[in-house]
């Protein structure tokens, strides 16, 4: 029986325990907000990144790797950007005993590192569109309560794609492609999400507009797990990124970025988990099938040999498998692998050896079936598909049941008191009314639904602050 009581009621404690006990990260490193990746956690993250690399390859992005240090002179070129980040950067002021002539910034994100180089690389319309990406460590001095994978001072698996285009239309096409890449990745992770266009006061520093992707966590707060930004020519003018057009004239490029991080793993752990621990999608599980032999006295040899044969068969079929021969009781092993979220467990005992059968236990529903040995590989593959489908449907149901449309601030407050989630409310579009609603609801405006056709307020609806005709539906949530 799947229980999710602790998972939702004591999410914070549950999450910290799972991260630690399942071997994802060790947060005891002596710098607050900087954590050590442990082998199991890093393997899961690398499996997620494998899909990111595949999508980048498919869409013609080239991988690059930039230095982590940015000269203050470059960092300060785009005024809005520096204003947005200055309060949370780490400065390098000395080399040995000597103060540096030009201070260096540990990158909080890489626009200011990359764009002086883009100005050297991009020359003509033939160089466009120009599409690169990297996965690197970035540093932000978070003053809020730090939390592993969610709010950290060293984001160590930061994915950022940067593109340059001849015109605004092509940059818009890129944003659509980013959304498609993101959706493909979410399918691989069995996650359901929403996309919102951020309000003017909360867009990325230096952007023309920003889109954010959110999931709803077990405690009803939202977690931003992806962002896409259209910069128009804001950065290319600051960094002088010009290209020669076909008619021989010059113009500034249009730019976009797309970012994700280890918050993807935080979302997977949180949204699919239950009171026993993680439930990993088979797509990214380092171990997709674990075999636990359960011998009776005197049958050890035949049970172990049978289990070994199963391990070889699954491995030959391209399935990531592990045979658990540790000197521990089966019950202890079940507990351990359930905590680690292994999608399928194979149990074999003397009766299975006699009948040429195996018992398959699925982690998502905690159900068991007995199958014939010769059907094993097909059944396991079938289970993987079933698990992916079930996880996605459950995640989608969770998301949809936590989005509530209301008309007044009173109704919105009641939703937040009751169970949090996302509240959609009519809004006139004025910043002052949006900020007033944030204050009244003690929540953040995520923005308006995207694409914008979905964002129009129903006819006759009124902004709850000023009483004027509402133009948009605005989304509010308590966020991480």
Swiss-Prot record:
Q: How does it assemble?
A: Homodimer.
EC id: 6.1.1.15
Q: Which GO terms describe its biological process?
A: prolyl-tRNA aminoacylation
Does the keyword Transport feature in the UniProt annotation? no
Catalyzes what? tRNA(Pro) + L-proline + ATP = L-prolyl-tRNA(Pro) + AMP + diphosphate
Name by which UniProt lists this protein: Proline--tRNA ligase
PANTHER family, from UniProt?
BIFUNCTIONAL GLUTAMATE_PROLINE--TRNA LIGASE (PTHR43382:SF2), PROLYL-TRNA SYNTHETASE (PTHR43382)
Instruction: Tell me the classification of the organism that encodes this protein.
Output: Archaea, Methanobacteriati, Methanobacteriota, Thermococci, Thermococcales
Protein location: Cytoplasm
What is the enzyme's main class? Answer: ligase
The source organism is Pyrococcus horikoshii (strain ATCC 700860 / DSM 12428 / JCM 9974 / NBRC 100139 / OT-3)
Query: What are the alphabetically sorted keywords of the record?
Result: Aminoacyl-tRNA synthetase, ATP-binding, Cytoplasm, Ligase, Nucleotide-binding, Protein biosynthesis
Provide the function of this protein. Catalyzes the attachment of proline to tRNA(Pro) in a two-step reaction: proline is first activated by ATP to form Pro-AMP and then transferred to the acceptor end of tRNA(Pro).
